[in-house]
Structure formats: structure tokens, C-alpha cells
Curated annotation (Swiss-Prot):
Stretch forming the transit peptide: 1-53
The name this protein goes by in its record: Kinesin-like protein KIN-7D, chloroplastic
Subcellular localization: Plastid, Chloroplast
Family: Belongs to the TRAFAC class myosin-kinesin ATPase superfamily. Kinesin family. KIN-7 subfamily.
One CC-aspect GO term: microtubule
Keyword S-adenosyl-L-methionine assigned: no
Length: 1007
């Protein structure tokens, strides 16, 4: 690399001096004890810089306290200020950079310092610096785990990756199946925290958006384009963004995979699939205490923003067209982000341009100090990107000086969605109890005589009918309430732990591991997406975390696990749109979108991260510790057996599922009958769009109901199998439970088959009707064919008879001529042809005459067109001949004029020329003394030559004109001959038509 200029070295020295000043900041313990003033909204009040890790607010909590460990001490004094957590992650050199001779320009000097290889005095200190061999799981534990924990406690959090293009931002945030990124690890950790907090209920919602060319698009709803950013007292928000309530990690990861399908990516010189937009994945967390005794307590509300920024691009990218436009918008938003961070840290009360870009406007509340912020800067050590890496490090150094204050958000009123769901569930349960306990009392029957027995009997029958209808209505209302309670209860997640245990132990222990199941890994890309354009792979060896195995065992395990994942991924993709599986076998109605696969040979991967379990059975056995529906979770051997209360809840849950299954089956049968009726109406009026729309709507409803039925069918056996101990207490043997399950399945299959049979029967009736109609049509066609064949036979017979009659007539005439004696027998007449034969013959002749007439008309039309064309040609030729004659006349006049001029010029010139020549021959001395006559002679000679040339040109033109005149005359003669031929043909045609008419008259009319 070339030597730095002097000015650049001075700037580097000043930066190093700044680092030295930063290193002399107080220690972490001193910072935590120091009570800093709360900054005003929008600008910081302190310019103190620090490079220590931001304080993790994890108080020492009691194990036997009545409150949850996550939410103990919420009403204490406000927490002290923190600095933004800034970490730096290096990616390894790619094979292409190694082949090109790239050198390491920046390196990690320890765990907290980044130093320049060219100028060791230039260094920057951060909370943590990760070497190229560091795994994403280690990055998450340091840079993101405390932010996720705070978000589950009610503190807003923001985690975003910043860096140039192809530095590994998307790999760090999203990862792949071998190394899940920050976003999958955060989602998994959030559900693990729910499992470890048994005395609180949680409601999780997610949204996923992108900022592409300064336009906000909803990735979960492709129709949500160009959304607007609004503001309210709680901060900025996107109007019209779609939020999905998530029930499991696989559910959330499937939404991320579906959103990634709609994200804008493109190819550049550095990346085969480069992110062309910023994405923000938001996890909204609401929680409240469990039980009705804590009904009046506030609901905690927080948002966790996981941001994947697009990489800044330099001029070396050499982009054009759309890519250049995208790069300009990306650089503009990142430049605005840098400006905002600079103004936040300079300590001056100046205007902060949050509104200059959509990205900074959405990050306004996070950067203004409301919540915890973690910045992960991804850099490349290559010398070709040394300047870009230096800019990223300076940006991270400025961001480290931002101060934030983590405070818990509480919602006292009824605006919380979880509070709304809880109140509605409570109200529906009360209504259900009223329906169960309600007793319909009739009017007491008074003593009546024998005369009124019939009247009272009739009234009693009427009352029974009314009571029966009322009972049916109440049963329907009960079923609807059960379905509503089940649907709402599924959305609220609670832990399976029956006892209160603390997440945080006073003594340090092993960190919680994040074991992903196969159904969760299926929604992550198999290979990292941000591929550097290369034909080689760069897989570095990473240490095995928590597993004491040798290098050969680790390689063999990764090889086997890769084969299992490939088999599972292929099976998923063959299915197309697969069904999402939750932790207890529930099927979500979301369609899985598989992220685009990338070539294996063109990737530069971070080190692979081995998981704890290495077999498909082990993964499925320890997939999730939470479940869906009625707040119940799968039984875990680590946390003991379920309590009797939980068992009773599970029994009620199974009953609810069965009731809902019956309701859905009835609804499917009802919708099927409605669809049948609409189909009949559509057959009668196929152009009615309203009926078509109703049919489509009913079909969609039937599909949704069938999908729900399939989901319930899978939930019921799973719930029964997870509670075999409870079944033993209730004297239900496994065989009886299996028989009951099979009975339910068979009954449902029978209902479905009955509905299918009805549909098939209707289709069969329609096909039978169509077959009968086709048979009638075939019989009719056969009859017509038979009649046609008979007519053809009669026609051929009549023709043969006519020919025979003609031959006999000629023979008789010949015989009469030879004998020349007429044989007339008085009183006898010659035999006549049958009248039918004559009629057929006349019809045939009429058809022939019609054909002849049509041919003649066609021929006349053609001749008329040809004659018209010939007349046009003749008139055009006459006009052209006239024009040519006029032109010839003009040229002849001009030729005569030129000839006269030439004659006048030629007459004196030869004499003067001859005399001059003789004079020059006689005496050369006399020519020297007479220059004027010689000049005149030369001028005359030149004039004569010019006139001769003009004359030759005129003669050539005259010859050309003469040739054209001859051609015109020939063309005129040809056209005249053609015209004459045409008239002859017309006359012949008229004559032939006259003869034909005469023949027709003589042949038919005369006879």
C-alpha cells in the first residue's frame, strides 16, 4: 500500500491522541456508581466519552420473593445513564482478496482495540472487538443478549449492523442454518425468557419493513407500499404496517423468510446478492402478571428493533442505472445517520436533522436516549478497503459517545392489546358459565279441570318446541364462545413452570444455549446470502463450544449434520408451500417462503457454529419449551411434572378442541351445501359476477375451515399423549384414549367423505345428463346420415336412368333415320320418364346453372377490374407521353439555340487562329513583339473548347431524351395493344355469354 500523505498522518496522530484521552476515562464500577443527570429530549447534556462496556442493569434478586425476577424493583429510582454498546466484527479475507495480494490493513489488538497495520499509532477502543474466528453466537452474547433481556422487561431496544458493502452485515443479522444470526438468536432467546418467567403472560407481535430508495415498504404485506411515517406522544410509527401475532420461534422465522422474499437485492462488483435496502424487524412485547388477582396492575410494553442496514458504496463499485440510483439513496441515508450521530455527540444545542431521511426518523426515539442501543460494525481487514474501514471505525467511535437511559414502559389504560384480549376472554368465560348454569323455567301450570286438558297439552307441546329451538340457539352460542375463547387464548404465551425460579443466579453459571430445531432452521438460508464474487469457499475452523470433542469428531459431526439438514431442506422445498409446525404439533396457517439459495462454491462464510444436538431425534426432542393454546406448554423433564391444576386445564383444553372440531365440521358441511346451491345458480346464469365472487368467498372459507380442522386434529392427539398420567388418574387407559381418538378421526373422515360423496353424486348426475344428451345428439346425427345416404343413392339411380334413357333415345333416332319410316301407332303414346326423376334432373341443372352463373359473374368482375386497370394505364401513358413530347420540344428549341450560338462563335475564330499560326511560323521574332493578338487567340481557343464541351453535353442529353421518347412510344404501343386485347376479350366474353344464354333458352325453355 502507498505511503500516507502528511496530512493523513497528522489526522491519524490526532485520532490516536483522542483514543489515548478516551482510555483514561473512569472504570466501569465508577461509572455505575456515578449518578448522571437525565438528558433532555433531543440533545445530550454531557460530552463525557467512555470506551468501557455499557452497564448491564441486572440487580441482585431474591429467589423467594413474590415478584418475578424479570420485573422486580420496577418502582425504584431511575436507572443511571448508559452509553451505546459498540462492537466491531472483522470478517476474514476472501480467496479473491488473497489471490490479488491484499494485505491486512486493520487488525484486532486484544478484545477492545482496533489498530492500523500501516500506522500502529492509530487505534480505536470499543466495548468489544471480535476477530474473524469469532462465532455469531459469541457476538450475540456480548452485543445483543442484554438488549433482548431488557426488551422482555419492558425497555425498548435497538440492534443494528453498520458497515460497507460485502463486510458481513446480513450474515451477522440473519445468518444461515450453520450459523444463525442475531435476529434468529434474539427470537429464540425471547421465547426462552417467556419459558423462564412463569408468573407473567406475554403477547408477541412482529412487523417487518424495508426502506428502499427512501420509500417505506411492508415486507409482510406486498400490497403495503410507500407507507407514511407518523408521530404520536409515544414516538414515531409507520402508518398501515402489518403486525402478526407470533406463537413460536418457527412462526416468527417463517415470517422473516417470507419478508426476505420481497426484499430488494441486486448484484454488484463486490456482492452477488447485495442488500439494496435497509430492513427493520420489530418485535413488540406486551406482558402482564398472571392471575385475576393482579388485574389492576400496569402492562409493560416494549419494542425490539433489529436493523440490517444496506452497505455504503464507493466509486469502485462502478454501478450504473438502477444500481447507481440505489447506491445514491443508500449513501444519503447513511450520511444523514452519521450527521445525526455527530450532532448528538458534539454537546451543542443545535438542530438535529432526524427528518432528512426515513431511516433516522424511524431511529429518532432510539438515538435520543429512549432505550438500549447496540451497534455492531462489520469491517473487512483488506488493504483495498482501508479507507472505508477507517470511516466505519470513526463512525463507531462517535456513536460510542451517545448516552441513553433505559427506562421501563408501562401502559395503565386499556390500550394494551394483551389487556384487551384478557378482558375479552374473561367476559366470554362469564357468558359461557351463564349459558352452562342457566336454567330455563317455564310458566307454572295451574290446576285445571278435565275440560282444559287438551288446551294445556297443546300449550305444553308449543312450549317444548320453543324450548328446543332456544336450546339449539344456546348451544350454537356456546360453541361460538368456545371457539372465540380458544382463538384468543392461543395468542397469549405463558410458561410451563409451576414454581417461581429465578433467571439470574447470584453465582455465575453456564450461559443459556440456543438450540434450534429443524423446523426453525428450515426458514434460515442454507448458505449465507451476502456472497463475495468468487469461485472458492472460505471455511475457517472454529472452536467447538461446550463440547469436549476432538478435531476429527467435530468434522465428522458437521458432515453428518449437514447431510441431515440437506435432506430436511429438500423435503421442505419439494412440498412447495409447507405448513409451519409449532412446539406442540400445531399447524400455523402461514405459507413458508424459502429464501433464494446461493451457489455453494461462491461463498465466504464465517466459521460454522456447532449446535448441542447432532441428530434429528435429539433436535425434535428438545425443540421448544413453550406451546400454543390455552396458555399450556409441553411437558419438560427438566422442570418436573405438571400439577393437577395444569392437568385439569389440559383436559378442558382437549374438550375445547373437540368442541371446536365439531363446530368446524358442521360449518364445512353448511358451506358445502351453500357452495352447491351457488354452483347451480352459476350454471343457470354464468355471467353473474356476484355469484362468482360469493363462490370464491365460500371456497376460501371452506379451505380455511379444513385447514383449522387439520390443525385441531394434530393438536388433540398431542395433548392426549402429553397427559397420560392425568388419563390414568381419571381411569382412562391408553387404549381407550386411542380408541376415542380413532373414533373422532373416523367420524370426521366419515363426515368429510359424506360431503365429498354428495359432491361426487351431483357431479355424477350432471355427467349422466350430459351423456344422455350426447346419446340423443348421436342418434339424431345417425338419422341425418341415413337420410343423406338414401338421397345420395336415389340421385345416383336417377343419373343412371337418365343416361340409359339418353342412350335409348339416340338408338331409336338412329333406327328411325335408317328406316326413314315413321312408326306411329294410333292410340299409343311414348313412355315418359317418372316425374320424380325429371324433378331431380331439373334441380341438378338449376344447381349447375347457378354455379355457371357465379363463375361468369366472377369472371366478369375480374375482366371489369382488368379493363379499369388498363384504362388507368392508358390514361397515365397518355399524360406521360404528352409531358415527354413537351420536354422534347423544349430540348429541340434549346438545341437549335445552342447550335446557332456555336455557329456564330465558330465563324471568325478559325481564320484568326490560322492567321495567327501562320504568323507564328513565319517569324518568331514578330510573335514576341505582338502579345495582344496571341492572347486573343488563346482566349478564343479556350472559348471554343468550352462551347464544344457544352455542345457535346447537349447532344448527350438530346440522345437520352430521344431514347426516352422511343421507350415511351414503345410503352404506349404496348399499352394500346393490351387495351385492344382487353376489348377483344370483353367482346368474346359478351359473345360467349350470349351463346350460353341462347343455349340455355333453347335447351331448357324451348324443350
Amino acid at each position: 500500500m502507498a505511503t500516507r500523505p502528511a496530512s493523513r498522518q497528522r489526522r491519524a496522530s490526532s485520532a490516536a491522541a483522542a483514543v489515548a484521552v478516551v482510555r483514561s476515562s473512569p472504570q466501569p464500577q465508577q461509572q455505575q456508581q456515578q449518578q448522571l443527570p437525565i438528558p433532555q429530549s433531543g440533545s445530550p447534556t454531557s460530552t463525557t466519552t467512555t470506551t468501557t462496556s455499557s452497564s448491564r442493569l441486572t440487580p441482585e434478586l431474591s429467589l423467594d420473593g413474590p415478584a418475578s425476577p424479570l420485573f422486580a424493583g420496577l418502582d425504584e429510582d431511575p436507572a443511571p445513564k448508559e452509553n451505546v454498546t459498540v462492537t466491531v466484527r472483522f470478517r476474514p479475507l476472501s480467496p479473491r482478496e488473497i489471490r490479488q495480494g491484499e494485505e491486512v490493513a486493520w487488525y484486532a489488538d486484544g478484545d477492545t482495540v482496533v489498530r492500523s497495520e500501516q500506522n500502529p499509532s492509530v487505534a480505536y477502543a470499543y466495548d468489544r472487538v471480535f476477530a474473524p474466528t469469532t462465532t455469531t453466537r459469541q457476538v450475540y452474547d456480548v452485543a445483543a443478549q442484554h438488549v433482548v433481556s431488557g426488551a422482555m422487561e419492558g425497555v425498548n431496544g435497538t440492534i443494528f449492523a453498520y458497515g460497507v458493502t460485502s463486510s458481513g452485515k446480513t450474515h451477522t443479522m440473519h445468518g444461515d442454518q450453520r450459523s444463525p444470526g442475531i435476529i434468529p438468536l434474539a427470537v429464540k432467546d425471547a421465547f426462552s425468557i417467556i419459558q423462564e418467567t412463569p408468573n407473567r403472560e406475554f403477547l408477541l407481535r412482529v412487523s417487518y419493513l424495508e426502506i428502499y430508495n427512501e420509500v417505506v415498504n411492508d415486507l409482510l404485506n406486498p400490497a403495503g407500499q410507500n407507507l407514511r411515517i407518523r408521530e404520536d406522544p409515544q414516538g414515531t410509527f409507520v402508518e398501515g404496517i402489518k403486525e402478526e401475532v407470533v406463537l413460536s420461534p418457527a412462526h416468527a422465522l417463517s415470517l422473516i423468510a417470507a419478508g426476505e422474499e420481497h426484499r430488494h437485492v441486486g448484484s454488484t462488483n463486490f456482492n452477488l446478492l447485495s442488500s439494496r435496502s435497509h430492513t427493520i424487524f420489530t418485535l413488540t412485547v406486551e406482558s402482564s402478571p398472571c392471575g385475576e388477582s393482579n388485574e389492576g396492575e400496569a402492562v409493560t410494553f416494549s419494542q425490539l428493533n433489529l436493523i440490517d442496514l444496506a452497505g455504503s458504496e464507493s466509486s469502485r463499485a462502478e454501478t450504473t442505472g438502477v444500481r447507481r440510483k440505489e447506491g445514491s439513496y443508500i449513501n444519503k441515508s447513511l450520511l444523514t445517520l452519521g450527521t445525526v450521530i455527530s450532532k448528538l455527540t458534539d454537546g451543542k444545542a443545535t438542530h438535529i436533522p432526524f427528518r432528512d431521511s426515513k431511516l433516522t426518523r424511524l431511529l429518532q426515539s432510539s438515538l435520543s436516549g429512549q432505550g438500549r442501543v447496540s451497534l455492531i460494525c462489520t469491517v473487512t481487514p483488506a488493504s483495498s478497503n482501508s479507507e472505508e474501514t477507517h470511516n466505519t471505525l470513526k463512525f463507531a467511535h462517535r456513536a460510542k459517545r451517545i448516552e441513553v437511559q433505559a427506562s421501563q414502559n408501562k401502559i395503565i389504560d386499556e390500550k394494551s392489546l394483551i389487556k384487551k384480549y384478557q378482558n375479552e376472554i374473561r367476559r366470554l368465560k362469564e357468558e359461557l358459565e351463564q349459558l352452562k348454569m342457566g336454567i330455563i323455567t317455564g310458566t307454572p301450570v295451574k290446576d285445571a279441570g278435565e275440560d282444559n286438558i287438551i288446551l294445556w297439552k297443546q300449550k305444553l307441546e308449543d312450549g317444548n318446541v320453543k324450548l328446543q329451538s332456544r336450546l339449539e340457539q344456546e348451544e350454537e352460542a356456546k360453541a361460538a364462545l368456545l371457539a372465540r375463547i380458544q382463538r384468543l387464548t392461543k395468542l397469549i404465551l405463558v410458561s410451563t413452570k409451576a414454581t417461581q425460579t429465578s433467571r439470574f443466579s447470584p453465582h455465575p453459571g453456564p450461559r443459556r444455549r440456543h438450540s434450534f430445531g429443524e423446523e426453525e432452521l428450515a426458514y434460515l438460508p442454507y448458505k449465507r446470502r451476502d456472497i463475495v464474487l468468487d469461485n472458492e469457499s472460505n471455511e475457517l475452523l472454529s472452536p467447538v463450544e461446550g463440547l469436549g470433542m476432538t478435531l476429527e469428531d467435530s468434522k465428522e459431526e458437521k458432515k453428518n449434520r449437514k447431510g441431515i439438514l440437506n435432506w430436511f431442506k429438500l423435503r421442505k422445498r419439494e412440498g412447495g408451500a409447507s405448513i409451519l409446525t409449532s412446539s406442540e404439533g400445531d399447524k400455523s396457517s402461514l405459507t413458508k417462503s424459502t429464501a433464494p439459495s446461493t451457489p455453494i462454491g461462491e461463498s465466504v462464510n464465517f466459521p460454522s457454529e456447532p449446535r448441542i444436538s447432532n441428530s434429528l431425534v435429539g433436535e425434535s426432542a428438545s425443540v421448544d419449551l413453550f406451546s400454543i393454546g390455552h396458555g399450556e406448554f409441553a411437558t419438560d423433564s427438566l422442570h418436573g411434572e405438571e400439577t393437577p391444576l395444569a392437568s385439569r386445564k389440559t383436559i378442558d383444553h382437549v374438550d375445547l378442541l373437540r368442541e371446536q372440531l365439531k363446530i368446524l365440521s358442521g360449518e364445512v358441511a353448511l358451506h358445502t351445501s351453500v357452495l352447491k346451491r351457488l354452483t347451480e345458480e352459476a350454471g343457470r346464469s354464468p355471467n353473474n359476477e356476484k355469484i362468482q365472487m360469493e363462490m370464491k368467498k365460500v371456497n376460501d372459507e371452506i379451505k380455511g375451515k379444513k385447514h383449522q380442522i387439520a390443525s385441531l386434529e394434530r393438536q388433540i392427539p398431542h395433548s392426549i399423549s402429553n397427559n397420560q398420567g392425568m388419563a390414568d388418574k381419571l381411569e382412562l387407559t391408553p387404549s381407550y384414549a386411542e380408541l376415542l381418538e380413532q373414533l373422532n378421526e373416523k367420524s370426521f373422515d366419515l363426515e368429510v367423505k359424506a360431503a365429498d360423496n354428495r359432491v361426487i353424486q351431483d357431479q355424477l348426475n350432471e355427467k349422466t345428463t350430459e351423456c344422455m344428451e350426447l346419446q340423443e345428439e348421436v342418434a339424431h346425427l345417425k338419422e341425418q346420415l341415413y337420410q343423406t345416404l338414401q338421397a345420395k343413392d336415389s340421385l345416383s339411380n336417377s343419373i343412371m336412368m337418365q343416361k340409359n334413357a339418353g342412350i335409348n333415345h339416340e338408338t331409336d333416332n338412329h333406327a328411325d333415320q335408317e328406316l326413314s319410316v315413321p312408326r306411329e301407332v294410333p292410340g299409343e303414346t311414348s313412355p315418359k320418364e317418372p316425374q320424380s326423376v325429371e324433378i331431380d334432373e331439373l334441380k341438378q341443372k338449376v344447381c349447375e346453372l347457378i354455379e355457371v352463373k357465379a363463375q361468369l359473374e366472377t369472371r366478369n368482375q375480374k375482366l371489369l377490374e382488368e379493363s379499369t386497370y388498363a384504362k388507368g394505364l392508358a390514361s397515365a401513358a397518355g399524360v406521360e407521353l404528352k409531358a415527354l413530347s413537351e420536354e422534347v420540344t423544349k430540348l429541340m428549341n434549346q438545341n437549335e439555340k445552342l447550335a446557332s450560338e456555336l455557329a456564330s462563335v465558330r465563324s471568325p475564330t478559325p481564320r484568326r487562329a490560322n492567321s495567327g499560326l501562320r504568323g507564328t511560323r513565319r517569324d518568331s521574332i514578330s510573335r514576341r513583339h505582338e502579345p495582344a493578338p496571341r492572347r486573343d487567340n488563346n482566349a478564343g481557343y479556350e472559348r471554343e473548347k468550352a462551347l464544344e464541351a457544352v455542345l457535346m453535353e447537349k447532344e448527350q442529353k438530346e440522345a437520352e431524351l430521344q431514347r426516352r421518347i422511343e421507350e415511351s412510344k414503345q410503352k404506349e404501343a404496348f399499352l394500346e395493344s393490351e387495351l385492344a386485347n382487353m376489348w377483344v376479350l370483353v367482346a368474346k366474353l359478351k359473345k360467349s355469354q350470349g351463346h350460353d344464354l341462347e343455349d340455355f333458352d333453347t335447351k331448357y325453355i324451348g324443350s
